[in-house]
Amino acid sequence: MEKLIIQGGQPLVGDVHIEGAKNAVLPIMAAALLASKGPVELTNVPILSDVFMMQDVLKSLDARVKFDEQRNYLMIDANQPLNFEAAFEYVSKMRASIVVMGPLLARLGHARVAMPGGCAIGSRPVDLHLKGFEALGATITQSHGYIEAKADQLVGANIYLDFPSVGATQNIMMAATLAKGTTVIENVAREPEIVDLANVLNKMGAKVFGAGTEEIRIEGVTELKGTEHSIVQDRIEAGTFMIAAAATKGNVLVEEAISEHNKPLLSKLAEMGAQVIEEENGIRIIGPDELKPSNIKTLPYPGFPTDMQAQMTALQLMAHGTSVMTETVFENRFMHLEELRRMNADYQIEGQSVILYGPPELTGAEVAASDLRAAAALVIAGLVANGETLVTNLQYMDRGYYHFHQKLRALGAHISRADFDEAGHRKTTQKLA
């Protein structure tokens, strides 16, 4: 079993490079299935386990995929006949793979996709995806752990999402690109990753208007072709390093960070006493000697992102005073707090909110990540805690952070990754790449 070993107490200092966005590249990879002429070529592709899993999903659908990790380059060729079934073997491991359903339905008129898996955060139902497909004229059946959608011809429709779901917005938008007529989707997600997907689709020949607003209009076309595209920067990775800098009283330049994508986080960091400095080549965060408490509520974009909630609660615990975090997007997203309690965190959960009493004297402990962002929160706490912290379940971390511990170590953290045997003895320690 691999574990991160962290000796806390070191401020993070230096510059950090941020990868392409995981939450952008996965649906864009799925969108490549829509191209019946020419390959889709992507650059700034993050090297993450989720990207490899999506690559396996696409290959199982008979797309040709080439991933050059040295260049962060990914080529997807879906010009040949495709398989309509995304098997349980792949889809069950990663929730985001449900986004192949819209492209398959649009391209083939038939999609059969295993119920998705991935991080254990709430129920995350796919009902909104399916209602959208039905509105476009598809027939939906569910049996034996699979969802099946069929349509002789998708037809444009007016669709209202009960909640601005990112995945549903992406899936319906992709399905509508080849539908007959015009589709209008209201109350859509507005995330930068939605805009990035729309940009790719339009480069492929689609007619998508309004991405980034509350309403998206898609005028259907008869075919889409390959294109080239560079993946937008990962605002969640950028935000994670910003929080880590503030937590450790550090001084970190997050290279090429896009302030427009992180407004709520930057506002809260400043409110808590951090210096937020926009420079020509990025955003610099300088942590304060004493953090101030804050009250935060997660909301769909452009509100405070739920994917930053776990990391931010770790920071709130370090503030001098009482802070509150309210989670409105997903249920069961406070699971990391039980692990932080092992490090001496003091808090009280009340419904959708958690009251965080700071600052505790955080002490190192062995803790287990329950999901991707929980892993980041535990690492941030370990960077500040007295003594040694061991973080396990690193497979979650690898889904969304590339060379996380190497980047932290380059900033001055005392952190390494090692393999342990069943008796708990350390076997090897990975060197800084």
Curated annotation (Swiss-Prot):
This is UDP-N-acetylglucosamine 1-carboxyvinyltransferase 1. GO terms for cellular component: cytoplasm. NCBIfam families: murA, PRK09369.1. It catalyses: phosphoenolpyruvate + UDP-N-acetyl-alpha-D-glucosamine = UDP-N-acetyl-3-O-(1-carboxyvinyl)-alpha-D-glucosamine + phosphate. It comes from the Bacteria. GO terms for biological process: cell division; cell wall organization; peptidoglycan biosynthetic process; regulation of cell shape; UDP-N-acetylgalactosamine biosynthetic process. Cell wall formation. Adds enolpyruvyl to UDP-N-acetylglucosamine. It comes from Latilactobacillus sakei subsp. sakei (strain 23K). Pathway: Cell wall biogenesis; peptidoglycan biosynthesis. InterPro entries: Enolpyruvate_Tfrase_dom, Enolpyruvate_Tfrase_sf, MurA_subfamily, RNA3'P_cycl/enolpyr_Trfase_a/b, UDP_GlcNAc_COvinyl_MurA. The modification 2-(S-cysteinyl)pyruvic acid O-phosphothioketal is found at residue 119. One of its GO terms (molecular function) is UDP-N-acetylglucosamine 1-carboxyvinyltransferase activity.
